[in-house]
């Protein structure tokens, strides 16, 4: 039984015997029987920090070899079998690894005698219920890239693993009749066993299908020697692990993995358990996919008979609106797992893989209108510039706006899009390598790959440089503006401080000063009016005094002249009463004096008016123009 589970595989040019225990691979080198101590500690279910400490101490005690380059699964600390047995006894896993330690490889079938399983015909029942398929030119199953754990991976080993994976992938032939090489032959166990109608298969089907069966069959735990845990239990070649994974049955999955179930076993359509579980929503309903994907993550890099990866199947699930959220849930978890365990280039090539119709997972999502799934793929290095065999692009079904995250989206994936786009700009060669890995569909696609895209990247690089120069110039202008602003703020603060000192922080200082000034102006105007009044009074008094004085003088002289005239007239009358002309002369003299008096009064009035005007001008000059304004307002009112 154990011999059937031990397989000879070549990693980085080194042949090893591989034995899967509880979902973890354990390797023993064929040429020296050394074992991978790192994998033994993983089987003991120790976390990475503890494994690291144990291996550091263990390596100091004896012979060992650390492998960091090459294939990821082959990496780790290798020790002789004696030291491996010692380590296994220390952590109570010797019983689990004993079959591989005792295995000599003598009963192992030469790989050259393996027959490619794609030539095996399905059963009659399967052929009756299956649609007619075209002949597939790829091997029976395709492990696109050897799954690598991120635990012991460095940047150097990651790149080495990529080259090994690409070289292994190039070894796949396009003819199903070509004998399998060391890589394809080593995956002989991946193909599901033929359909079996024995009691084991029927019991497993009853467990999965009948509602009243809640406990796994006893033989799952007892593991009888005649039970093949990787055998197909239905007419489609599904193994028990396929069923358990699709139904989200974690208890059964753990039991099957403990029994040695192969994570990468496939059905007749070369579909793995991981592919089958994303075709249904049970793991979404139970929220168990995160655990299931961890258990089945070794199969994340595989594709089926139609060239479709697990991401293609999730995209197909998104064709139903009722299953859209489940598809997004599956897509998010698997993309996180893929990018956490694989390098950027390998992850991008797996995500952008085309099926037999040339469809990528992104194109299928776009065709189904699954915007959220498309956004997730774009945030994890998916390319929207890969057409299918009909020349269709994802942008033919969804606009760029539909496939971009909203600006107000606070999702962490929103910020990751920008980082991934920057990575794509920094490493455009990876995209060009992917596009050139397949034969161009037409002359135009070849021209696009080798001429247009490099020009686009060149233009983008120049645009980036121009943007950086413009940004530097704007930054300099901004710095100068900030310095000027800081200087202005400092001056403003100084002025404010001086003002506060002058006003004693009185907010009504200006109002109070204005009111005081108005009060002083009114007081000054009142003083001017009083001065004018007194000046007018004094001048009027003096004028009256002068008028009275001159009037008295005038009246006395006139009366004297009249008296003298009368005396003369009376004397003449007495002496010569015949002389009448003297009286007429007296009347003429009196009239002339009256006219002169009136003329003097007019001149006096004119002088009085001029005097008042001069006084007003003097007062207005002293009051800076306010006196006339106030007098005008008062006269108008």
Swiss-Prot record:
ANK repeats lie at residues 236-265, 357-386. Residues 114-137 are annotated as: Disordered. The keyword ATP-binding does not apply. GO terms for biological process: positive regulation of DNA-templated transcription; positive regulation of transcription by RNA polymerase II; regulation of transcription by RNA polymerase II. InterPro entries: Ankyrin_rpt, Ankyrin_rpt-contain_sf, HTH_APSES_sf, KilA/APSES_HTH, SWI6-like, Tscrpt_reg_HTH_APSES-type. GO terms for molecular function: DNA-binding transcription activator activity, RNA polymerase II-specific; RNA polymerase II cis-regulatory region sequence-specific DNA binding. The keyword Cell cycle applies. It comes from the Eukaryota. Pfam families: Ank (PF00023), KilA-N (PF04383). Residues 37-58 bind DNA. Keywords: ANK repeat, Cell cycle, DNA-binding, Repeat. Residues 6-112 form the HTH APSES-type domain. DSC1 contains cdc10 and sct1/res1. Acts as a positive regulator of the mitotic cell cycle and as a negative regulator of sexual differentiation. May be involved in the transcriptional regulation of the cdc22 and cdt1 genes. Is an integral component of the DSC1-like complex. This is Cell division cycle-related protein res1/sct1. It comes from Schizosaccharomyces pombe (strain 972 / ATCC 24843) (Fission yeast).
């Amino acid at each position: 039984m154990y011999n059937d589970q031990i397989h000879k595989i070549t990693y980085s040019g080194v042949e090893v015997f591989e034995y899967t225990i509880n979902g973890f691979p354990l390797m023993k080198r064929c040429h020296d029987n050394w074992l991978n101590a790192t994998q033994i500690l993983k089987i003991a279910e120790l976390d990475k920090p503890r494994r690291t400490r144990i291996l550091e101490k263990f390596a100091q005690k004896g012979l060992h070899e650390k492998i960091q380059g090459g294939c990821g699964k082959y990496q780790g600390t290798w020790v002789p079998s004696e030291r491996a047995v010692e380590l296994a006894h220390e952590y109570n896993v010797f019983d689990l690894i004993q079959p591989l330690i005792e295995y000599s490889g003598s009963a192992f079938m030469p790989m050259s005698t393996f027959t490619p399983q794609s030539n095996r015909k399905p059963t009659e029942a399967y052929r009756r219920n299956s649609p007619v398929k075209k002949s597939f030119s790829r091997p029976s199953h395709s492990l696109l890239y050897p799954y690598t754990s991120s635990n012991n991976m460095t940047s150097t080993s990651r790149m080495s693993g990529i080259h090994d994976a690409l070289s292994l992938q190039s070894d796949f032939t396009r003819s199903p009749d070509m004998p399998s090489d060391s890589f394809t032959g080593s995956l002989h166990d991946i193909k599901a066993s033929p359909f079996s109608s024995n009691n084991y298969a029927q019991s497993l089907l009853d467990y999965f299908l009948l509602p009243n069966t809640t406990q796994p069959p006893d033989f799952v735990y007892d593991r009888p020697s005649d039970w093949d845990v990787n055998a197909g239990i239905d007419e489609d070649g599904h193994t028990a692990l396929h069923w358990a994974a699709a139904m989200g049955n974690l208890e059964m999955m753990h039991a099957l993995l403990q029994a040695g179930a192969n994570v990468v076993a496939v059905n007749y359509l070369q579909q793995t358990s991981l592919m089958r579980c994303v075709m249904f929503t049970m793991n979404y309903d139970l929220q168990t996919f995160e655990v299931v994907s961890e258990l089945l993550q070794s199969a994340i890099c595989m594709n089926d008979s139609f060239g479709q990866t697990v991401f293609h199947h999730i995209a197909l699930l998104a064709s139903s609106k009722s299953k859209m959220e489940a598809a997004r849930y599956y897509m998010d978890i698997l993309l996180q797992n893929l990018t956490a365990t694989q390098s950027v280039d390998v992850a991008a090539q797996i995500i952008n893989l085309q099926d037999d119709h040339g469809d990528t997972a992104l194109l299928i999502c776009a065709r189904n209108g699954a915007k959220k799934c498309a956004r997730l793929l774009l945030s994890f290095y998916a390319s929207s510039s890969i057409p299918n065999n009909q020349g269709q692009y994802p942008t033919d079904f969804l606009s760029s706006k539909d496939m971009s995250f909203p600006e107000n989206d606070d999702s962490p994936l929103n910020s990751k899009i920008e980082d991934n786009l920057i990575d794509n700009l920094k490493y455009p060669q990876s995209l060009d390598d992917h596009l050139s890995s397949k034969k161009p569909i037409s002359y135009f696609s070849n021209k696009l790959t080798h001429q247009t895209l490099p020009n686009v990247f060149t233009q983008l690089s120049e645009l980036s440089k121009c943007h950086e120069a413009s940004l530097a110039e704007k930054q300099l202008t901004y710095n100068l503006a900030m310095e000027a602003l800081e200087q202005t703020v400092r001056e403003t603060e100084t002025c404010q401080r001086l003002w506060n000192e002058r006003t004693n922080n009185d907010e009504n200082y200006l109002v109070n000063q204005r009111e005081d000034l108005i009060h002083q102006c009114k007081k000054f105007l009142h003083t001017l009016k009083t001065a004018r009044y007194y000046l007018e009074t004094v001048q009027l008094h003096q004028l009256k005094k002068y008028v009275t004085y001159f009037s008295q003088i005038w009246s006395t002289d006139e009366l004297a002249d009249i008296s003298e005239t009368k005396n003369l007239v009376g004397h003449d009358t007495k002496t010569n009463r015949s002389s009448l002309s003297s009286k007429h002369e007296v009347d003429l003299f009196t009239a002339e004096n009256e006219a002169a008096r009136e003329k003097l009064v007019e001149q006096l009035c004119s002088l009085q008016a001029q005097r008042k005007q001069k006084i007003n001008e003097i007062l207005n000059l002293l009051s800076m123009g306010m006196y006339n304004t106030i007098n005008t307002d008062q006269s108008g009112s």
